[in-house]
Amino acid sequence: MGTGKKEATRRAKGGETGNGFGNIRVKGVNFYRDAKKVKKLSMYKEGRAKHNARGEEVQAATFQSKEIPNARIDPNRRWFGNTRVIAQDALNHFREALGETKRDSYQVLLRQNKLPMSLLEENNKIPQVKVVETESYANTFGPKAQRKKPQLAVGDFAELASAADESQQDFEAKKEEDNSWKVDGWSQEAKEAIFHKGQSKRIWNELYKVIDSSDVVIHVLDARDPLGTRCTSVEQYIKKEAPHKHLIFVLNKCDLVPTWVAAAWVKHLSQDYPTLAFHASITNSFGKGSLIQLLRQYSALHPDRQQISVGFIGYPNTGKSSIINTLRKKKVCKTAPIPGETKVWQYITLMKRIFLIDCPGIVPPSQKDSETDILFRGVVRVEHVSYPEQYIPALLERCETKHLERTYEVSGWSNATEFLEKIARKHGRLLKGGEPDESGIAKLILNDFNRGKIPWFVPPPQAEDMENVKFAAGEGRLGEMKKREIHEAPAATETAEETKEEEFKGFDD
């Protein structure tokens, strides 16, 4: 009896189920080949056609029958409907209107019809066609010309000259971009590891996560140097890979520059994307209402979505987290006057339909930027820089002497060494033997430079239409350029000229 119990237990553990007749061979059934295997082997035999004794084909091979099968057209009313056609003139007009609309940064595409847009858009790339080999000059322009009219892209010599100029400009821009690392035949200089901050794979992964999760992307720029803190490569990526996402420029720290400088930069950047001037402060902000109103408009453009996400990208230390705190009226993101405070992306709820995404600062690699440019943009922390006194001469060239004299209450220096020595002796920063602590004072000055205690800014480009447009001081908002443009107004012109000619005295601490 004990043996029987063990045998029953062993069978149960072995997984044997059923009545025990599963492995019994039935007569007439192939035991070694199943139906799938038999079908596969028969397919190998059917590969050739069958012929009779006279060599005539009796049965065609698989998929090689010459008999036409009976076809049947799907009954659909669209076969009998009108066909939509368009003339060439109307197509050209539509193509021009489409191009003008795409170039306008203040127009948004709400709905797109099912049209072959690839056929309507003009391809900027020149196809690699060997025209001379396919159509010779004699067959095109000579007495034996076979075409009535040569296929030219221009109509007269003026258009040909303008097309040649545009082609030359594009070629020079591309050449400068490709050969930016070649400077007078010298090779690229090795940079310190600290100047490669913001370029790690982790930071780029955070950036791509923010871009993929955002419906509206806000590019935060520093009002003192907007072009220096502009990520052109990220803009091109969004324009190419995600054209359905909306991009906005926010000119932060506009309180550190004069009003006419901020207004000129807003007008210049508005040619590419919608631009707003902003001052991040929980208690005393500027541009907050305009930004929230703009986000509400983008939210209204997508009524089918329950909410939209707004991502903040840009260089480190440009004030992305501070703008989010300003919009929420409380500290929801960790901020600091040093770069690299935000490590990972963070979701913040602004309202029921709008969410904000904070992103770490990104620094696109560029061979044109020197170590001085990277340091002055606030990308790296000054305390980690070796020999900070070597950057003081460039700082003296970028800042005016009167601003430095008023900030540090020293005067009468001829070079950077004397400037550091005077400030060190005034503040009592001396080493053994009465030697001035140049390194410590240089770090102090660089921190003041990045944090806005020393007034400086990059002048805006003087556009051709800027001469006829004046900005009245103290009227409207910087984001609303149409309300601030005053044409042929004598009183406003005099006020603007007085404001621009007035000496910029800096800012109070």
From Swiss-Prot:
Is GTP-binding one of the keywords? yes
A Pfam family (short name) is MMR_HSR1
Name where it's found: Nucleus, Nucleolus
GO BP term (any one) = ribosome biogenesis
Every CP-type G domain range: 204-365
A GO CC annotation given for this chain: nucleolus
InterPro entries in the record: G_CP_dom, GNL2_CP_dom, GTP-bd, GTP-bd_ortho_bundle_sf, NOG2_N_dom, P-loop_NTPase, TRAFAC_YlqF/YawG_RiboMat
Task: Give coiled-coil spans as residue ranges.
Answer: none
Keywords on record? GTP-binding, Nucleotide-binding, Nucleus, Ribosome biogenesis
A GO molecular-function term, please?
Answer: GTP binding
User: Which family, according to the similarity comment?
Assistant: Belongs to the TRAFAC class YlqF/YawG GTPase family. NOG2 subfamily.
- Briefly, what is this protein's role? GTPase that associates with pre-60S ribosomal subunits in the nucleolus and is required for their nuclear export and maturation.
Instruction: Give the protein's recorded name.
Output: Nucleolar GTP-binding protein 2
Q: Which gene encodes it?
A: NOG2
